[in-house]
């Protein structure tokens, strides 16, 4: 499984000759992404409707160009009206391609005062596990802590806190429940620094708790080898 990190929580997963784009959002977006990076897309997964995860204008162009399907919640569908949408919900498990399955996980977006009045409250939030038969990658979406017994090899999750998502301490607790072979922090490119985690503190806590991790730059790609993890 090959993983490329893009803006905020966006990931491009390449496996079994398929290209799966997760949460293409508007933060740090450039036209090069649409024109050269987010090309030949076979499926798009969207966790929730906030624009840093769902840049509707660009997603519609990708769908039209590549004729790909979008797997997302009914709330995203209500606001975005994408063509080729497959509506999914928590606990669904779907084989989207031969030997590639997605599992739809629980996710609970945090709430700040005023989000409901400004129509930014997230009612329906989901995460995804991509399983290609060899590797399981779990991207959590913007979620606060909850009990779970999800299993994965690669865990992609936020640590920025601020009442909206997992912070560093509760994020470590969340990660230890899952015990991944590799953790990739996401959701760290907000233009306001106060909305991003303290990277040095995050590294210290991950290392103290013995969690193997990789902090990826935008555009960076890794090939995950379950037998030889050396990041």
Residue ranges and their predicted role:
Residues 1, 14-20, 93-103, 131-137, ...:
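Beta-strand-turn-beta hairpins that frame and shape the catalytic cleft
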Residues 4, 81-96, 172, 176, ...:
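Binuclear metal-ion centers of metallo-dependent hydrolases, dominated by the metallo-beta-lactamase
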Residues 12-49, 56-61, 111-119, 143-149:
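Pre-active-site segment of Zn-dependent metallo-hydrolases
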Residues 21-25, 41-52, 70-74, 137-141, ...:
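Active-site neighborhood of phospho(di)ester-bond hydrolases with catalytic His/Asp-centered motifs
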Residues 33-97, 101-111:
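Active-site HxH/HxHxD metal-binding segment of metal-dependent hydrolases
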């Amino acid at each position: 499984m090959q993983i490329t990190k893009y803006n905020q929580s966006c990931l491009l997963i390449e496996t079994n000759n398929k290209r799966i784009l997760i949460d293409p959002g508007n933060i740090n977006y450039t036209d090069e992404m649409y024109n050269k990076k987010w090309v030949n897309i076979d499926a798009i997964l969207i966790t929730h409707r906030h624009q840093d995860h769902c840049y509707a204008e660009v997603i519609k162009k990708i769908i039209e160009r590549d004729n790909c399907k979008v797997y997302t919640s009914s709330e995203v569908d209500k606001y975005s009206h994408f063509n080729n949408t497959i509506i999914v919900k928590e606990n669904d498990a779907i084989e989207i391609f031969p030997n590639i399955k997605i599992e739809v996980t629980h996710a609970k977006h945090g709430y700040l005062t005023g989000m409901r009045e400004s129509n930014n409250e997230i009612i329906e939030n989901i995460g995804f596990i991509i399983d290609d038969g060899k590797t399981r990658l779990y991207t959590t979406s913007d979620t606060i802590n909850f009990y779970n017994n999800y299993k994965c090899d690669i865990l992609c999750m936020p640590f920025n806190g601020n009442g909206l998502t997992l912070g560093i301490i509760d994020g470590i607790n969340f990660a230890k429940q899952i015990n991944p072979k590799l953790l990739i922090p996401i959701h760290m490119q907000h233009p306001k620094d106060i909305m991003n985690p303290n990277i040095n503190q995050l590294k210290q806590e991950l290392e103290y708790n013995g969690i193997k991790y990789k902090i990826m730059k935008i555009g960076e790609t890794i090939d995950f080898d379950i037998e030889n993890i050396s990041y």
